Design a protein with these regions (language model features):
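P-loop/Walker-type NTP enzyme "switch/lid" segment
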Residues: 2-15, 22-103, 107, 193-198
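Structural beta-sheet core signal
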Residues: 36-37, 94, 118, 152-154
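Inter-motif core of Ras-like GTPase G domains
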Residues: 104-124
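Conserved C-terminal guanine-recognition region of P-loop GTPase G domains, centered on the G4
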Residues: 130-145
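Beta-strand-loop-alpha "switch" segments that mediate conformational coupling across diverse proteins
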Residues: 156-161, 165-197
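Inter-lobe coupling/hinge region of RecA-like P-loop helicase motors
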Residues: 187-209, 213
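Long, low-complexity, intrinsically disordered segments
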Residues: 235-268
């Protein structure tokens, strides 16, 4: 029985869904869990990445291959077919297609996953585009027979930039849960497609994995310190603050997590 099922979702392509899915699958697998990565995007980016990585020059196939299973399932019936396919896996991660072009497939993935992660850069346009994703999640809740949680993963963040803190405040004010860890803008991530995962970039993704485990404790049987997703979601849009002006939101500033955890868990 799957312990954690996660879908990466967004309205548009190019938001970091595939990158997030592959790196997360890698760190979960490195921690000793059985991982299934589901490529639900008709473009097959995750599967292509896997194929290219396995042929990486200078490495034997067994060294270059991803340390987890990957299957292609771009289907509107994903939520019906995946339980049998994933019945022996501890973690299932679904790389969904962009909702604007493949809504049926994306909805099927949202019906299956217990946690929905929305990758989002700290920019006004990307924050505003999370609203249709939230609307899809709300519709899916009506037809599910078990709870679903959702959170935003801030990615492509510039170190010490105010935009990251402003984006977190705006998202919280809009009613979202935002993971404590942010993914910085690094070349190791931007240039990682088609090559084996480099351990030098895994530190951040281990922290993201810890955040997810804490959030999903009620579903996965792991102790959680994450807050509940209760409360309403205001249907507002974010406007960036003017230079020198006050923040447009009243949410408390949350400092992004940095540095490795000292908990002694496999995610450190």
């Amino acid at each position: 029985m799957t312990g954690l099922s996660l879908a990466l979702a967004n309205l548009k392509p190019g938001t970091g869904k595939t990158t997030s899915a592959v790196w997360l699958a890698h760190v979960f697998a490195q921690a000793g869990t059985s991982v299934l990565l589901v490529d639900a995007d008709p473009s097959g980016s995750a599967l292509e990445w896997s194929d290219l990585a396995a042929m990486y020059p200078g490495l034997a196939p067994e060294q270059a291959a991803f340390p987890f299973r990957i299957v292609a399932l771009p289907s509107r019936e994903l939520h019906r077919r995946l339980p049998e396919i994933a019945k022996h896996d501890d973690v299932v991660i679904i790389d969904t297609p962009q909702i604007e072009d493949h809504a049926g497939i994306a909805r099927s993935a949202l019906r299956y996953a217990d946690e929905i992660l929305i990758p989002c850069a700290p920019s006004p346009i990307e924050i505003n585009r999370t609203t249709p994703v939230r609307d899809e999640i709300a519709e899916v809740r009506e037809v599910r027979d078990k709870p679903v949680r959702s959170a935003v993963l801030l990615n492509r963040c510039v170190a010490r930039a105010h935009s990251t803190t402003d984006a977190r405040e705006a998202l919280v004010d809009l009613g979202y849960d935002v993971l404590s860890t942010v993914v910085p803008r690094r070349e190791v991530y931007a240039q990682s497609f088609g090559v084996p995962i480099k351990h030098a970039g895994c530190d951040v993704w281990r922290q993201v994995a810890r955040d997810l485990i804490e959030r999903c404790a009620p579903l996965c049987g792991v102790r959680s310190r994450a807050r509940s997703e209760s409360g309403s979601c205001a249907r507002r849009r974010w406007r960036p603050r003017r230079a020198g002006g006050p923040s447009p939101t009243r949410a408390r500033r949350a400092r992004p997590r940095s540095g490795p955890s000292r908990s002694g868990s496999p995610w450190t």
